[in-house]
Amino acid sequence: IENKKNIFAYGNSAYEMYEKAPANIQISHPLSNGVIADINNMERLIHLFISDMSKGNIRPADFYIAVPTDITEVEKRAFYDLIKDANVKARKIMVVEKAIADGLGMDIDVKNSQGVLVVDIGYDTTEVSILSLGGIVLSRLIKTGGLKFDEAVRQTVRREFNLLIGQKTAATIRQSIGDLEKEGKGAVVYG
């Protein structure tokens, strides 16, 4: 946020500026623990994001908002209201549980009778869910995510090497040592 009113950058562009932003640019995290923490900046971000995606020509569209399973109905309603009040020409607004959206996004057959474990590690939360027969059998939102892992990396580097590193460097270290996909590592668990 530049000069407390204009969004200067968001997403990856904003992350590149993290820990390097000048004094007139404030880094904002409008979501915290899976819920809206800063409604004003979230509204501005939604407008900018949709405008960028549609190249300024906003046409009526269906909106599907993926939300954590363990949040309250009031918190879910806040996401719905955010889109409804954003004046983005929504034909339909659907709030869907994130675990189902994650499963579909990973091309998992969520309607299968065999249970599927989905673990979504986010910035400050981790959602662990078991999906079966098109629904969520069990889901828990844990208030620990990549940010806490990064802090653990920072503390370990400080303790072991007497070296201070920033959050972005810690995130890079975490991602390089914790990426299961690159080395083809995985696990099949029966029980």
Spans of model-derived segments:
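Nucleotide/phosphate-binding catalytic cleft detector across ATP-hydrolyzing
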Residues: 1-123, 130-191
